[in-house]
Curated annotation (Swiss-Prot):
It comes from the Bacteria. This is UPF0349 protein GK2958. InterPro entries: DUF1450, UPF0349. It comes from Geobacillus kaustophilus (strain HTA426). Belongs to the UPF0349 family.
């Protein structure tokens, strides 16, 4: 089972799209887009994704990608 990275379409429009594009190049991740992930306040404040159901954020797309990989290293699935 691969790690699941979930993005909100509103947050993609706010800037996390670049992070999603970078992560889609990794064949060891499942990337999913949703119309809304119900994190509206946080979504308006920062770039974010849900990583295996946990909120991970970053100030820039590059920082978001870095934080996602750090989260995956610190929280292995198995």
């Amino acid at each position: 089972m691969l790690p699941i990275i979930e993005f909100c379409i509103s947050n993609l429009a706010s800037g996390s799209y670049k992070a999603m594009e970078m992560l889609e190049k990794d064949p060891n991740l499942d990337i999913i887009e949703y119309s809304c992930l119900s994190y509206c306040t946080r979504c308006a404040e920062t770039l974010f994704a849900l990583v295996n159901g946990e909120f991970v954020s970053g100030e820039t797309p590059e920082q978001l990608v870095e934080n996602i990989y750090r989260h995956l290293e610190e929280n292995p699935m198995f």
